[in-house]
């Protein structure tokens, strides 16, 4: 089994694929990170600094490795790459005569975020009312216009879609972004959900058996998707067939599981598990093989004490099998009464209907019975502690917000909130940034190109006002985003989608 170890302060990093997996092929790099195209006419209105020699001076750097922030640094960007990182403008040596020099005193530069649970859709509940009731079916409209802009505006320069309901749309959208015709991040396109029978989502194909799972993976791999995701009602046999076919093609597979437990999936060779430890069902009462429980993992999370034997045993199993875990804390924060409200800029991106649905959800949470509120709060704290314990044991934690939940988690804004919640979980700010940047790059096998601020890597960078290493909420103040050395204007991108998320 391939394994790469990277030593950084306080965190063990590794790159591997599940049992029996093939090496990540070099073609994956060219698919996810193709040669950059010049921004076209439709993209230029959102460009603040066209590519060219750019020098960022007097800036604080959080480099993505988990190490302490470094003050008064100079970063030279040229030809879409980080040409140099030095401790002063003088140390950078002679600058190109045509270089654009920015004095970024009072600002911090981070690596571009590598979002690992970053959907391109919105979940709509028809005729949702204040009591939380809606009419079937659940609908999943594609946000091909608004989502890529929201991600890029908030510093997400590479993302994994982590499940698709319109895979052809996602593939075509990626091609348009890569060609410079539409603004958006680099994209690892995940295939359609590999779901079993029983899903409430009418847009998902229910797998008939393991042969269907294998054929589905093969078909979409041939069409260009670069990852796969198993979903709640998939059986062990179907999951095993999907894993084997994905690995045969050098691709990875993750899962938001229910009918299959975390231990079972790890034994089958899965590469990643979504939603931290919030959806594991192994301790749910009455759990039967290949059957999703009514609890959907709530009982397991509530009963699994972070320092208890069940948690330690599970974490050891996942670490020993090199299974990554994706943290998606913002979507679970929605169930905690009194959680932080949407930031005004995020709220402004929602359609009136999405805004109403979000407020319904928030009010329902606040008005839940006291015992339910207490139970959810305790479960959320368990989830935070389990993710921290997983990393302490040597596990690879990656991150994404899961922008669902009636508009309660918004693309891009949710990625930033995820970093804040990782700090709440006990990580240092620099370590939280690492989880959201370099760790995702390592999982994708792209750490030689993205994920940290190092000379020679792609110039995917986020400039924020303030110092997130001391006040993590400063990470919300994104002022400039570089992708392949091109500086994008977050405010222009946000204005273009104002009131649009939830519509298109």
Please tell me what each predicted stretch does.
Residues 108-181, 200, 205, 211, ...:
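Metal-associated gating/positioning segment near the N- to mid-region
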Residues 58, 107, 117-121, 256, ...:
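Histidine-centered divalent metal-coordination motifs
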Residues 7-18:
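Bacterial N-terminal signal peptides
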Residues 458-501:
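C-terminal cap of metal-dependent C-N hydrolases
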Residues 216-229, 234, 279-425, 498-504:
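Active-site neighborhoods of metal-dependent hydrolases
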Residues 144-167, 185-192, 221-234, 252-254, ...:
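Divalent metal-dependent hydrolysis catalytic cores, especially in the metallo-beta-lactamase
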Residues 59-61, 373-375, 380-381, 385, ...:
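C-terminal helical cap
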Residues 38-41, 46-48, 52, 61, ...:
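Histidine-rich, glycine-flanked metal-binding segment
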């Amino acid at each position: 089994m391939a394994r790469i170890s990277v030593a950084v302060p306080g965190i063990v990093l590794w790159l591997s694929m599940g049992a029996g997996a093939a090496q990540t092929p070099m073609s994956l790099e060219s698919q996810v990170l193709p040669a950059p195209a010049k921004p076209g006419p439709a993209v230029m209105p959102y460009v603040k600094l066209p590519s060219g020699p750019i020098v960022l001076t007097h800036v604080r750097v959080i480099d993505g490795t988990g190490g302490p922030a470094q003050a008064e640094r100079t970063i030279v960007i040229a030809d879409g790459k980080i040409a140099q990182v030095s401790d002063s403008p003088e140390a950078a040596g002679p600058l190109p005569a045509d270089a654009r020099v920015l004095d970024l005193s009072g600002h911090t530069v981070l690596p571009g975020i590598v979002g690992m649970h970053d959907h391109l859709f919105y979940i709509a509940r028809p005729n949702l009312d204040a009591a939380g009731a809606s009419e079937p079916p659940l609908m999943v409209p594609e946000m091909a216009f608004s989502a890529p802009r929201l991600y890029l505006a908030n510093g997400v320069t590479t993302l994994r879609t982590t499940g698709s309901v319109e895979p052809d749309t996602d593939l075509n959208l990626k091609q348009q972004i890569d060609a410079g015709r539409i603004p958006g991040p680099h994209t690892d396109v995940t295939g359609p959900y590999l779901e079993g029978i029983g899903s409430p989502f009418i847009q998902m194909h229910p797998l008939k058996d393991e042969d269907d799972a294998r054929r589905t993976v093969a078909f979409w791999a041939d069409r260009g998707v670069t990852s796969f995701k198993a979903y709640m009602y998939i059986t062990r046999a179907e999951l095993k067939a999907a894993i084997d076919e994905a690995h045969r093609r050098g691709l990875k597979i993750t899962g938001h599981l229910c009918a299959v437990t975390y231990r079972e999936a790890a034994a089958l060779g899965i590469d990643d598990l979504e939603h931290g430890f919030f959806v594991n069902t192994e301790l749910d009462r009455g759990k039967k093989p290949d059957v999703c429980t009514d609890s959907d993992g709530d009982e397991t999370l509530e009963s699994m004490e972070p320092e208890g034997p069940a948690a330690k045993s599970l974490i050891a199993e996942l670490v020993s099998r090199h299974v990554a875990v994706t943290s998606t804390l913002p979507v679970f924060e929605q169930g905690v009464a009194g959680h932080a409200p949407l930031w005004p800029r995020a709220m402004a991106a929602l359609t009136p209907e999405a805004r109403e649905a979000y407020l319904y959800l928030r009010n329902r949470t606040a008005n839940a019975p006291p015992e339910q509120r207490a139970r959810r709060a305790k479960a959320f704290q368990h989830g935070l502690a389990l993710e921290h314990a997983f990393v302490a044991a040597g596990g690879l934690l990656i991150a994404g917000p899961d922008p669902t939940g009636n508009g309660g988690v918004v693309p891009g804004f949710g990625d930033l909130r995820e970093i804040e919640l990782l700090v709440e979980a006990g990580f240092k700010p620099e370590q939280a940034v690492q989880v959201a940047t370099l760790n995702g790059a390592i999982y994708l096998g792209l750490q030689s190109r993205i994920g940290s601020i190092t000379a020679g890597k792609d110039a995917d960078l986020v400039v924020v006002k303030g110092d997130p290493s001391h006040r993590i909420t400063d990470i919300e103040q994104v002022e400039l985003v570089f992708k392949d050395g091109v500086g994008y204007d977050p405010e222009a991108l946000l204005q273009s989608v104002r009131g649009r998320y939830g519509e298109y």
